[in-house]
Amino acid sequence: MATTFLRNLFSQAQPSLLRRPLMPSSSSILPAAARLFSSTPAQNATLNQVMRGCRKPQRARHAVSPALSSIKSPALKGVCVKVGITRPKKPNSGERKTARVRLSTGKVITAYIPGEGHNISQHSVVLVRGGRAQDCPGVRYHLVRGALDLAGVATRMSSRSKYGTKKPKKASVG
């Protein structure tokens, strides 16, 4: 089996593999336009590397927000099952407001409530988007402020669009 593989490998149109120069010439340093920004020449896998299985495809990354990415939806509606707090991971301290939400697909997830203060309670209808809370374990979703039953942050002046706050009215002079 291995001898047949080796015979086919070297007998076809690859005699240059046996007579490869020790140092690459200046013409072989940039073999393709795809390698223009690389500082080293492209190297093919050796026979031992191929036999070990180096040409397996890379595994796909896991989804950050699997309940949304599995149905390819940017946001989903859900009903709050429980509202509570979560303690953040080690270097941080505080209380992060979270909610357990039953999505319209039937899955129950934990979502972070952004901003200061909120008005949701059990049975509130909320809109859930992807994106994890980096210092809260198991929290892979955010609630959208200013959508459905979750009101925007009332006193917010900067980054208002992220917190569902309307532009404040200008005070009229006179």
Swiss-Prot record:
InterPro entries: NA-bd_OB-fold, Ribosomal_uS12, Ribosomal_uS12_bac. It comes from the Eukaryota. One of its GO terms (biological process) is translation. The keyword Ribonucleoprotein applies. It is found in: Mitochondrion. GO terms for cellular component: mitochondrial small ribosomal subunit; ribosome. Keywords: Mitochondrion, Ribonucleoprotein, Ribosomal protein. The keyword Aminoacyl-tRNA synthetase does not apply. GO terms for molecular function: structural constituent of ribosome. Component of the mitochondrial ribosome (mitoribosome), a dedicated translation machinery responsible for the synthesis of mitochondrial genome-encoded proteins, including at least some of the essential transmembrane subunits of the mitochondrial respiratory chain. The mitoribosomes are attached to the mitochondrial inner membrane and translation products are cotranslationally integrated into the membrane. Belongs to the universal ribosomal protein uS12 family. NCBIfam families: rpsL_bact. Component of the mitochondrial small ribosomal subunit (mt-SSU). Mature N.crassa 74S mitochondrial ribosomes consist of a small (37S) and a large (54S) subunit. The 37S small subunit contains a 16S ribosomal RNA (16S mt-rRNA) and 32 different proteins. The 54S large subunit contains a 23S rRNA (23S mt-rRNA) and 42 different proteins. uS12m forms part of the decoding center of the mt-SSU. This is Small ribosomal subunit protein uS12m. The lineage of its organism: Eukaryota, Fungi, Dikarya, Ascomycota, Pezizomycotina. The gene is mrps12.
